[in-house]
Amino acid sequence: MEVRNMVDYELLKKVVEAPGVSGYEFLGIRDVVIEEIKDYVDEVKVDKLGNVIAHKKGEGPKVMIAAHMDQIGLMVTHIEKNGFLRVAPIGGVDPKTLIAQRFKVWIDKGKFIYGVGASVPPHIQKPEDRKKAPDWDQIFIDIGAESKEEAEDMGVKIGTVITWDGRLERLGKHRFVSIAFDDRIAVYTILEVAKQLKDAKADVYFVATVQEEVGLRGARTSAFGIEPDYGFAIDVTIAADIPGTPEHKQVTHLGKGTAIKIMDRSVICHPTIVRWLEELAKKHEIPYQLEILLGGGTDAGAIHLTKAGVPTGALSVPARYIHSNTEVVDERDVDATVELMTKALENIHELKI
């Protein structure tokens, strides 16, 4: 089956490379979302927590589609007297992924300095320590400062946030590698759905949520305000189709289509919605796979518990090496996710729960 809508590379690049760790989405990604979606909806607003809520008015049930715009990162907790930065994780950061990496230290909106993730060199470690993964007390960021005063003069202070210095690149024929595909590939998806959606049988709220990586916080507050009849979350999921992973633990595979979520740690998707999405995918020949993720959650986990409860489903884009600066996705899976979400909104009046 041929890809019907190839990825817009320049838009995807803009979305994934914009800064915005949890709680600091205003540093870049929030403005990108507003600029790219405003011409395809009737109203855009930013709520008190920072969620971008784009309303495309229509007749029919009220539907919320969430994609979180925050990314994992670091926060400065201490500046050493010799200028090195001590940091803490924002979201699920594995300290092994920090060593020998380049970082952007965000001094202000649109302004950063470079840093390098470092630890004690293996050459001078004890033999037993070389076998251990570093912990947070052994990691620091080197920004080239020679003193605490110099680091402060460069603009660094307690609470300064840090992202990987990553960029979007093609990887083979159909794949991309980038920083922050979790969850900017879903942000890209809702932008594309908003553009393509011509005849929605619903009152649609596209929501770029904040602070998902630290507890599904933006989805919880935005869903409370919207009070949707149905909810959908779009996120990445694990594609562990790599050497060394048993087949029953691979979760999903790159290039085999969008993943219709059955369950993750935060939600059991409404079975009627799961079956309905499957039927739509089959009817429109959209490639799909089924997903059960035993670790990790999504905004669906917050949406479905809103007020008296919201029937909720979720679509996932398979991704390798998530929570790193080299996450990998396949454009065919992205395309399938856009297609199925669009078809769902065009046919939502047929869903009966």
Curated annotation (Swiss-Prot):
<feature type="binding site">
    <location>
        <position position="323"/>
    </location>
    <ligand>
        <name>Zn(2+) 2</name>
    </ligand>
</feature>
<dbReference type="InterPro" id="IPR051464">
    <property type="entry name" value="Peptidase_M42_aminopept"/>
</dbReference>
<feature type="binding site">
    <location>
        <position position="68"/>
    </location>
    <ligand>
        <name>Zn(2+) 1</name>
    </ligand>
</feature>
<keyword id="KW-0031">Aminopeptidase</keyword>
<feature type="binding site">
    <location>
        <position position="182"/>
    </location>
    <ligand>
        <name>Zn(2+) 2</name>
    </ligand>
</feature>
<dbReference type="GO" id="GO:0004177">
    <property type="term" value="F:aminopeptidase activity"/>
</dbReference>
<protein>
    <recommendedName>
        <fullName>Tetrahedral aminopeptidase</fullName>
        <ecNumber>3.4.11.-</ecNumber>
    </recommendedName>
</protein>
<comment type="similarity">
    <text>Belongs to the peptidase M42 family.</text>
</comment>
<dbReference type="GO" id="GO:0008237">
    <property type="term" value="F:metallopeptidase activity"/>
</dbReference>
<keyword id="KW-0170">Cobalt</keyword>
<dbReference type="InterPro" id="IPR023367">
    <property type="entry name" value="Peptidase_M42_dom2"/>
</dbReference>
<keyword id="KW-0645">Protease</keyword>
<comment type="function">
    <text>Functions as an aminopeptidase, with a clear preference for leucine as the N-terminal amino acid. However, can also cleave moderately long polypeptide substrates of various compositions in a fairly unspecific manner. Has neither carboxypeptidase nor endoproteolytic activities, and it is devoid of N-terminal deblocking activity. Is involved in protein degradation, performing degradation of oligopeptides produced by the proteasome into single amino acids.</text>
</comment>
<dbReference type="InterPro" id="IPR008007">
    <property type="entry name" value="Peptidase_M42"/>
</dbReference>
<keyword id="KW-0479">Metal-binding</keyword>
<dbReference type="GO" id="GO:0046872">
    <property type="term" value="F:metal ion binding"/>
</dbReference>
<keyword id="KW-0862">Zinc</keyword>
<dbReference type="Pfam" id="PF05343">
    <property type="entry name" value="Peptidase_M42"/>
</dbReference>
<feature type="active site" description="Proton acceptor">
    <location>
        <position position="212"/>
    </location>
</feature>
<comment type="subunit">
    <text>Homododecamer. The assembly of six dimers results in a tetrahedral-shaped structure; all 12 active sites are located on the inside of the tetrahedron. Substrate access is granted by four pores with a maximal diameter of 18 Angstroms, allowing only small peptides and unfolded proteins access to the active site. Beside the four entry ports, TET contains 12 small product release openings, which are large enough to allow passage of only single amino acid residues.</text>
</comment>
<feature type="binding site">
    <location>
        <position position="213"/>
    </location>
    <ligand>
        <name>Zn(2+) 2</name>
    </ligand>
</feature>
<dbReference type="GO" id="GO:0006508">
    <property type="term" value="P:proteolysis"/>
</dbReference>
<feature type="binding site">
    <location>
        <position position="235"/>
    </location>
    <ligand>
        <name>Zn(2+) 1</name>
    </ligand>
</feature>
<keyword id="KW-0482">Metalloprotease</keyword>
<keyword id="KW-0378">Hydrolase</keyword>
<feature type="binding site">
    <location>
        <position position="182"/>
    </location>
    <ligand>
        <name>Zn(2+) 1</name>
    </ligand>
</feature>
